[in-house]
Amino acid sequence: MTTKINNEHKKVYVPNLRFPEFQGEWEKCKLGDYGKVVTGNTPPTKDIENYENGTYLWASPADLGTIKSITETKTMLSAQGFSKTRTLPKGSVLVTCIGSTIGKAGMATKEMSTNQQINSIVVNDNNDNEFVYYAIQSAFPRYLSSIAVQAVPIISKSAFELLPNNRPYLQEQKKIGRFLSMLDERIATQNKII
């Protein structure tokens, strides 16, 4: 997605393909620069009232990776259970950071929470959440090649925050995010037809 040019030891990051109205370098950043990183948690499972008649979304790795927008989850929480979690606002970007599904991602379509296998970015006002989702999806294979090999792959919250990325200014982020979202929607529509 990017071209690296080394001119007197200066690395310049610009995309190979770009909307014509944008120019200039992309800024080097870390995932933590996109917003606040939140690791999920699990309400006590021994207390059935945390889950009984649940209406609140609570994502686990099984809920991520097939579609971008998280509109339902396999496990739902009651109001009591939800109050015991770290809540995420609509638009947060969710990424599995432990286990065989590491790197699977999704985006919150409404306020929700996750279990501890997921790190989420509550995207700040200086960044576009759609762009952040696609930037992480694009870079994750590179991240996987750099993590330590172990029986259960894991990226801790602190390591996740430090993963490198590149970003343009907000207006370009928004245009890229909208464009890629539109492509995803068209692909999904075509898949339904087929």
Residue ranges of predicted features:
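Amphipathic alpha-helical segments with low aromatic content
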Residues: 1-27, 168-194
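Proline-centric
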Residues: 2, 20-25, 119-129, 141, ...
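Short beta-strand/turn micro-motifs at beta-sheet edges
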Residues: 4-6, 106-108, 148-153
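A short glycine-rich beta-alpha junction/loop motif
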Residues: 11-15, 97, 112-119, 149-171
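Non-catalytic DNA-recognition/assembly elements of restriction-modification systems
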Residues: 16-42, 66
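Localized chelating/binding microdomains
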Residues: 27-34, 134-138, 165-168
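Short coil/turn segments at secondary-structure boundaries
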Residues: 44-51, 149
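A short beta-sheet element
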Residues: 54, 60-64, 71-140
